[in-house]
UniProtKB/Swiss-Prot annotation:
Protein name: Thymidylate synthase
Lineage: Bacteria, Bacillati, Bacillota, Bacilli, Lactobacillales
Originating organism: Lactococcus lactis subsp. cremoris (strain SK11)
Pfam families tied to this protein: Thymidylat_synt
Residues noted as binding (6R)-5,10-methylene-5,6,7,8-tetrahydrofolate in the record, renumbered to the chain: D181, A278
Catalyzed reactions: dUMP + (6R)-5,10-methylene-5,6,7,8-tetrahydrofolate = 7,8-dihydrofolate + dTMP
Free-text function comment from the UniProt entry: Catalyzes the reductive methylation of 2'-deoxyuridine-5'-monophosphate (dUMP) to 2'-deoxythymidine-5'-monophosphate (dTMP) while utilizing 5,10-methylenetetrahydrofolate (mTHF) as the methyl donor and reductant in the reaction, yielding dihydrofolate (DHF) as a by-product. This enzymatic reaction provides an intracellular de novo source of dTMP, an essential precursor for DNA biosynthesis.
SUPFAM superfamilies membership: Thymidylate synthase/dCMP hydroxymethylase
Gene: thyA
Amino acid sequence: MTYADQVFKQNIQNILDNGVFSENARPKYKDGQMANSKYVTGSFVTYDLQKGEFPITTLRPIPIKSAIKELMWIYQDQTSELSVLEEKYGVKYWGEWRIGDGTIGQRYGATVKKYNIIGKLLEGLAKNPWNRRNIINLWQYEDFEETEGLLPCAFQTMFDVRREKDGQIYLDATLIQRSNDMLVAHHINAMQYVALQMMIAKHFSWKVGKFFYFVNNLHIYDNQFEQANELMKRTASEKEPRLVLNVPDGTNFFDIKPEDFELVDYEPVKPQLKFDLAI
């Protein structure tokens, strides 16, 4: 069993055994019912990417390619226009959060563009990678007041470098997430930001180091317990999947494409499970 599968099962068991139920939840299911969840707070895990510890479970298929396309919509295209996500990348699951003007509001990619977040990050890392201020922050109250829309879940990422004994510079990343759907989105979000970490490392010809993942509220929705128990019963694949970015060192961040990523040795357990999303 991979490290990621161990973490996946431990998190599920922890929520089932020690979690508490939310009250007066904001999200709703498609039938209009309130979508409460069982949750724990303060979940933290470290993945040593240098050692091949990638945060992807093999207990069910995870749509990594779509996740990476969504990431590029946010950080390369820098827009919240759903037409770009749907027509350029063929990713359609954000439609439920459309606010009426064809966007998801002044959120995510629109915030990245408004504050030139990626430009400032790359400039800061180029000037002084050892500076402890290389941060992405999508939690902008001004944007929340400007339009309606879902508030960012994965909202802050911090980057640090280390020069190891081999003389190479390694890029570490820390993702902070306010809320995470353990069964549906946990490994999607983690792998998205590992991909972002890899893109930035390639831009500077650095190695990829460690990925630190903190979730403030880690939950299982109250209509997902059957799926949770099924996942706990499954035997994980013996393969150890890893994500590879097949571009030369020094490739510009904005020149990297979704097809440059390759998920190697990924043989997830099937069949896929179905989930009714909370909106």
